[in-house]
Each structure stands twice: as C-alpha cells, then as structure tokens.
Amino acid sequence: MVIQKEKKSCGQVVEEWKEFVWNPRTHQFMGRTGTSWAFILLFYLVFYGFLTAMFTLTMWVMLQTVSDHTPKYQDRLATPGLMIRPKTENLDVIVNISDTESWDQHVQKLNKFLEPYNDSIQAQKNDVCRPGRYYEQPDNGVLNYPKRACQFNRTQLGNCSGIGDPTHYGYSTGQPCVFIKMNRVINFYAGANQSMNVTCVGKKDEDAENLGHFIMFPANGNIDLMYFPYYGKKFHVNYTQPLVAVKFLNVTPNVEVNVECRINAANIATDDERDKFAARVAFKLRINKA
C-alpha cells in the first residue's frame, strides 16, 4: 500500500522557510547559532589568511631572485629580430600614388615615429660617441645608473629623414622609404666587426626583378657598434634604437613584391629555417599607379 505524503500548502512552505532563516525558539540563523557562525567565520578567516600569507611570501622570495634591470634568463633571446616602419597590418606596405589617403596614414605614423630622432632632442639627451666600437658602461661594483646613450640623428637618414621633404618620405611619388628597426636585446654584441649592415632582396627571382633599385641610409645599411650593448629599459632610459632606411626607387607598379631584409654580423645567424624571424623581416610592397 503506497502512502502518499501530504502536500504542503504554500503558507506552510513560507513558514518553514522563515523558520529556517530565523528560528526564534533556538535563536538560530540559517541553521546555526551565533557562536557557530562566529567559529566558522573565524576558521575561514584564518584559513584564507594563511593561504594569502603563503602566496605573498612565495612571491616575495621569487622576486628577490629577479633583477629590476636585467632578465634572469636570456638564452632564447640571443638573436635579435627585425621590424619595419611604418607598422602595418600583416606587414603590407601598399601605396596608391593618386590616392592621398592611402599613403597619408603611413606618413603620419612615420612623423610620430621619427620625432624622438630629431637632432635637437638627440643633442639634449644623448652623447656624441666614437664610432666603430662598443659603448660599454660597466658598473665596476657600483650601480652605474642611468646609462648614457649615443646619438642617432634624424639627418643620418638622408632622403628618408622627412625633413623638408615635399615627397612625404617618397610616398607621394611612388618611391617610398621603409625603415628597418632591430629589436632590443640586452647585452647583445654583434662580434668583432666594425659595424653591422642590413641587406634587402626580393624573396624570389620574380620579386628581385620587380624590386628594382634602392638606396639605404646610413650608407650601405650600416649600423654602428657604438649603439651597443643595450642595458635595458630601466638602465638605458634615453636609448635610441639605430635605424636603416630603405628608399625603393623604381618598384614595378601594380605588382606585389615580397621583400626580405636581414641584419648581418659575425654573431648573428640568419640561416636558421626553424626561426624565420631571427635577424630578418619579410614584408610585401606594392605601388599602385593608375
């Protein structure tokens, strides 16, 4: 014989719920007395306080082993990468000569990017250094901070400096300037050579044919050793990265050209196919003419 439970009315359910929240007979709130609530809250307070203290202590111990100025591990940063300016989506530099808006955005980006390289700013913040040798600034037991940096003046970029340039870095005439920038690597030394240099080529035979002639600033795409080593953002406060400007003179119009630029030095390997971004950068260049 099945015994059916008596179905509670809505009022009974409400009364039971009210009694669960606050029972005036036992003075319990949500099934616990005030003392019980005090003990359980104290337990969780101590428990989570202990976890917080342990986390804080382990973080503090770890941070004592980390330098504010130099990364502890640099084995995966031995070879610097390259990047181009103007910075574009997918590294595609596309110029429509007759469409001002297509290249004006590049010009505005370059104006902002090159502003810190103005000769007046460089003379105010950085030193005139002796070329052909590293500008080393050892601590010798005493923290040598901040490190001084060598001047890289905008005028060194020649026809790509944008100073008094009616062609807007060549973008209005179909002879654009693309700037090659080497990423910063702390304590990087290029080797015993007097300088490094950037070289650019078409990736394939047809790209080489369509690329045409180009000139580089500084001459031969040289990057002097006096801009190295780099000591880090906090040490080298006013450090200015050296640049190489590539001015493309007669790119075949209306054709997409794949360009690859590399930095060459004794201590830089550019033939590692496992890392296609080591010491090189590839970008697409297209000059559209009506």
Swiss-Prot record:
GO terms for biological process: cell-substrate adhesion; intracellular potassium ion homeostasis; intracellular sodium ion homeostasis; lateral ventricle development; membrane repolarization; motor behavior; negative regulation of glial cell migration; neuronal-glial interaction involved in hindbrain glial-mediated radial cell migration. Glycans are attached at residues 96, 118, 153, 159, 193, 197, 238. Disulfide bonds join 129-150, 160-177, 200-261. The chain crosses the membrane at residues 40-67. The keyword Cell wall biogenesis/degradation does not apply. It comes from the Eukaryota. Highly expressed in brain (at protein level). Residues 193-290 are annotated as: immunoglobulin-like. Keywords: Cell adhesion, Cell membrane, Disulfide bond, Glycoprotein, Ion transport, Membrane, Potassium, Potassium transport, Signal-anchor, Sodium, Sodium transport, Sodium/potassium transport, Transmembrane, Transmembrane helix, Transport. The sodium/potassium-transporting ATPase is composed of a catalytic alpha subunit, an auxiliary non-catalytic beta subunit and an additional regulatory subunit. Interacts with isoform 2 of BSG. PANTHER family: SODIUM/POTASSIUM-DEPENDENT ATPASE BETA SUBUNIT, SODIUM_POTASSIUM-TRANSPORTING ATPASE SUBUNIT BETA-2. Belongs to the X(+)/potassium ATPases subunit beta family. This is the non-catalytic component of the active enzyme, which catalyzes the hydrolysis of ATP coupled with the exchange of Na(+) and K(+) ions across the plasma membrane. The exact function of the beta-2 subunit is not known. Mediates cell adhesion of neurons and astrocytes, and promotes neurite outgrowth. This is Sodium/potassium-transporting ATPase subunit beta-2. It comes from Rattus norvegicus.
